[in-house]
Design a protein with these regions (language model features):
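Asp-based, Mg2+/Mn2+-dependent phosphohydrolase catalytic module
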Residues: 1-9, 118-119, 123-205
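N-terminal helical cap/lid subdomain that shapes the substrate entry/recognition surface
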Residues: 2-99, 107, 118-121
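Generic structural signal for small/hydrophobic residues in well-ordered secondary structure
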Residues: 10-13, 60, 105, 113, ...
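Structured helix-beta-strand junction loops
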Residues: 107-108, 204
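Proline-centered loop/turn at the N-terminus of a beta-strand
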Residues: 110-112, 187
């Protein structure tokens, strides 16, 4: 198999840990007193009803204030803008060994982040984890107006990277994204930890 020329890294769950459960706990902490229990017991139904606003936000089709408006309308509450922003963003941990490994590989392989994310989260991560700024480029869903595993996302990413699909390798922790990339001709590995990744990369980089 030919050696990979360009590495494409998923962000959350690969280069940096994050937690959706922490997001909901954060939201509980900023709810008005009488709304907290209602929010807790209805969180699964709320997730479903807020799917469209959240999806639009990740695609860059809705602003942060428009997302907050949608949450307020659904919950019938008024939320402080900065408290909402802090609750929304404070879901990330620190980059670990995989990020350090990615940096070492970047010395010989151009490397890009491909992430389903929004402007708020990406800016927060860049400030919180400047050790990730070694990447040659960042391709977030909100800028290309498409989400992994949609073909449009990968097609746009390849245009930005400027390399043939078969010369690129995606590393992603979501199997559907791996399969979507492969359908577009991109080589892809399902991330299941650093040790397994090193084993699977042997001979490719």
């Amino acid at each position: 198999m030919a050696e990979v020329k360009v590495l494409l890294w998923d962000l959350g769950g690969v280069l940096i840990p994050f937690s959706h459960a922490r997001l909901w706990r954060n939201f509980l902490g900023i709810m008005p007193l009488g709304k907290s229990l209602k929010f807790f017991w209805r969180r699964e139904a709320l997730q479903k009803r807020l799917f469209k606003p959240l999806d639009d936000f990740e695609r860059g089709l809705r602003s942060f204030d428009e997302l907050r408006d949608a949450v307020e309308n659904e919950l019938k509450v008024t939320l402080d803008r900065e408290k909402f922003r802090n609750a929304w963003n404070d879901i990330f941990g620190r980059p670990g060994e995989t990020a350090a490994f990615a940096r070492a590989l970047q010395e010989s392989h151009p490397s890009y982040v491909l992430s389903n994310t929004n402007a708020e989260h990406l800016e927060y991560v860049k400030q919180k984890a400047p050790e990730l700024l070694f990447m040659d480029g960042w391709i977030p869903s909100y800028e290309v107006h498409a989400l992994k595993p949609e073909p449009e996302f990968f097609e746009r990413a390849l245009e930005i990277v400027g390399e043939e699909a078969g010369n690129c390798l995606l590393i992603d922790d979501r199997l559907e994204n791996v399969e979507g990339a492969r359908k577009c001709g991109i080589r892809a590995l399902h991330y299941r930890g650093l040790a397994k990744l090193k084993e699977e990369l042997n001979g490719q980089v």
